Structures are given as C-alpha cells and as structure tokens.
C-alpha cells in the first residue's frame, strides 16, 4: 500500500515506491507544481475507493524504450526544467488560480504544447498546439482562441458543458470535460477562461465568408446538411453548428478531415 509520501513523490517526481521510474506519460513534469495539500486530498479520496484486482500489463515498449533506467537521463534534462511559461498576461488572484488549474492540475500543456525531439514540452511555444497523432490539440493561446472565434464566456461554458457556439467537445477533449472540468465550480471555469484568454482578451475574430465552390456546396448538401442543416446552423444535441465551428477554422484542417473520414463515436 502506498503512503501519502509515496503518492506525492510519484505525482511530482515520477518515482514509484522502490525507486521505479514512471514514464512521463504520467504528467509529473506538470504535477511537480502541485501543492502538498492538493496531493494529500487526492490521496484521501482514492483511499475511499474500493480496491480492484487488476493485473498490471507487461511493458510492451520496444528496446531501448523499455529500459526505465534511461528515464534517469531524461529526468535530469527535463524534470527539473523551468515550469511551462504562462501563455497569457495577468496577475490577479483569479488569473493565478486559472494558471494553477491549467498548467498544473489540468496539465493542459501536456497535449496543447508542441514536443521536442526527446518528447519534452517545448517551453518556447506554450499552449501553441500539439500533435496527438490522428488528431491535433489546437492552439489555446489567447491569439489562437480568438482567431477561432472564442470569448472568455464561451471558453467557460465549454469547460463546464462541452458545448459552445464554436462546437462540442470530441475525442480526447470529451474525456477531459466528462471526467474532469465539468466537475469544477463555475468560479474555476471562469478562472480557467481568464487565464487561457488573458486579463485583456483579444477580440474574437468573426468568420470571413469565402467564395466556396458549387461542387463543395452540392457535396455538403448531399452528405452533411441532413444533420448539420442547409445553412450550417446545426441541430441542438444532434449535430453542432458549422457556421462558427472552431474545428473548421483551424489552419491545417487536420481535425476536420479526420472527423469526416473516421466519423466520431457517440459520446
């Protein structure tokens, strides 16, 4: 049985009892800023959960990545590096609370910050978007959010419900909302939105109407309009609106293309 000290060391340093090094898929490089009180509170909650008898699966990583001793070198390089720089400007207590929620407890940068050659977060590009393989975690800097039409009010609503005029949460972000952010208080939703957008948020950029093409229009009407409606207004709780959809406004279009090709499971 792990003690509170064992748990805190694993969370913030990536070291399990017996000196076993955890892979940084467990985001201890973000959790290293966690307060001892918050860690102890999490531990206390976990101790109220019934035990589950589940065998630990074997490490299936290929050589040399299955050698945990290599993590000693990785940790020397990156565990003690500076915290992720703030992605917005602010100084109020609410902004500070939002930063703690985003950068530490929520570890948003682990997905939304680009990675370096050795898998470390690129501290020079905080929250500027990360490659998740099939999907991209979008840029959630104030500029990036505003370019896709987000406002602080919409960000706060999205974190609480997974819904906003800019679209609905899907894939990994749906799990984040469902298992995490929707359980926060409205005050914490507002603090997160304040931090992500900054204390002087940039104005949301309106959608610029393009010329389009007759072929694209006919394809949309034939394949998409049945759910998303003829003018892209969507149907509540059935299909999101397309007019102001943030996924449509991402520069590379990858997430839109993957969503069309793969579809999205019901969530």
Regions found by a protein language model. Name each.
Residues 73-76, 85-116, 121-129, 210-237, ...:
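Sequence/structural segment immediately N-terminal to covalent heme-attachment motifs in c-type
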Residues 28, 61-66, 175-181, 209-215:
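Short amphipathic alpha-helical linker/capping segments at the junctions of internal repeats
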Residues 54-72:
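Extended, well-folded interaction surfaces typified by the phenylalanyl-tRNA synthetase beta subunit core
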Residues 17-20, 49-57, 91-95, 117-121, ...:
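Inter-heme linker and motif-flanking segments adjacent to c-type heme-binding CXXCH motifs
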Residues 31-33, 102, 145, 178-184, ...:
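Flexible gly/pro/ser-rich segments immediately N-terminal to CXXCH heme-c attachment motifs
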Residues 12-16, 31, 44-51, 103-106, ...:
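Sec-exported extracytoplasmic/periplasmic mature domains
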Residues 22-31, 80-86:
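Short acidic, glycine/Ser/Thr-rich loop/turn "cap" segments at secondary-structure junctions
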Residues 1-26, 36, 42, 46, ...:
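Extracytoplasmic electron-transfer domains, predominantly the class I c-type cytochrome c fold
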């Amino acid at each position: 049985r792990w003690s509170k000290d064992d748990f805190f060391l694993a969370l913030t340093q990536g070291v399990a009892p017996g000196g076993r090094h955890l892979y940084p898929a467990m985001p201890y490089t973000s959790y290293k800023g966690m307060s001892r009180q918050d860690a102890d509170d999490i531990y206390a909650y976990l101790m109220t959960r019934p035990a589950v008898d589940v065998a630990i699966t074997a490490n299936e990583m290929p050589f040399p990545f299955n050698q945990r001793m290599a993590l000693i070198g990785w940790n020397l390089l990156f565990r003690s590096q500076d915290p992720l720089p703030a992605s917005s400007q602010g100084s109020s207590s609410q902004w500070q609370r939002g930063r703690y929620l985003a950068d530490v407890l929520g570890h948003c940068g682990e997905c939304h910050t680009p990675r370096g050659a050795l898998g470390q977060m690129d501290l020079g590009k905080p929250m500027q978007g990360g490659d998740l393989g099939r999907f991209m975690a979008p840029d959630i800097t104030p500029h990036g959010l505003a370019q896709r039409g987000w406002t602080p009010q919409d960000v706060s609503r999205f974190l609480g419900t997974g819904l906003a005029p800019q679209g609905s949460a899907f894939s990994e972000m749906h799990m984040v909302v469902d298992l995490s952010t929707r359980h926060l208080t409205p005050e914490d939703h507002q603090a997160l939105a304040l931090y992500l957008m900054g204390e002087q948020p940039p104005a949301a950029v309106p959608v610029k109407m393009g010329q389009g093409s007759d072929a694209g229009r006919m394809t949309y009407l034939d394949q998409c309009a049945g759910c998303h409606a003829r003018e892209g207004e969507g149907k509540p709780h059935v299909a999101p609106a397309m007019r102001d959809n943030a996924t449509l406004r991402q520069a590379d279009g990858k997430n839109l293309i993957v969503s069309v090709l793969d579809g999205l499971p019901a969530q």
